[in-house]
Amino acid sequence: MNTIILAIDTATPAVTAGIVKLDGIEVLAERVSIDARAHAEQLTPNVLAALADAGLTVGDLGAVVVGCGPGPFTGLRVGMATAAAYGHALGIPVHGVCSLDAIGIESAGTVSEVLVVTDARRREVYWARYRDGVRIDGPSVNSPVDVPGAAEALARPAVYPTASGLVRAVADFSAEPAPLIPLYLRRPDAKPQQPAVTR
């Protein structure tokens, strides 16, 4: 298997694209833009810039890893559709991972237990709890007061999924990837309009 991986995440305000060499999880290049409203506009330029920074082209890629949330509808669709398009066009596998896992797995070996919390908007948070980098609870969406330790976690500086975390979150690159399924964890903000009642 070609060991050059494109890692993408658009589940948070960060628009992440990175090129990772699977051997040793070596990040060759990574581009991150923080803009919750510009995932579609920034993802492809970030991917192309990361490839250029690494001195590679899309033809050098052996697989794609994409964060599947939890996150907002539009943000997730941008990342997942882009990952699927690269996979289809290049004939390479696309592995979906929980975006919170990409953050939690980076804590392995540094702290025994960590709570990963991201903004779910509408005064709610997405969260999952990890022990030694392995998810032990979640992912879920709740009000911060309903998540033990969330207030403390929210007081810390923001951390977003990284290219290395996304790649580390894939359990087995030799296995057939599961279908990409977004982790919305709640109903969309937009609702179908009810027909007008006439009398």
What are these regions (language model features)?
Residues 47, 83, 104:
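Generic structural marker for isolated residues within well-ordered, non-membrane alpha-helices
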Residues 31, 61-64, 183:
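Generic beta-strand hydrophobic packing signal
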Residues 1-26, 34-42, 95-199:
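Oxyanion-binding and handling regions
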Residues 29-35, 68-72:
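A short glycine/serine-rich beta->alpha loop
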Residues 63-94:
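DPxDG-like acidic metal-binding loop motif
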Residues 49, 84, 88, 109, ...:
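Short, well-ordered alpha-helices that flank and scaffold nucleotide-derived cofactor binding pockets
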Residues 47-63, 149:
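Phosphate/pyrophosphate-binding loops at sites that engage ATP/ADP/AMP, CoA/4′-phosphopantetheine
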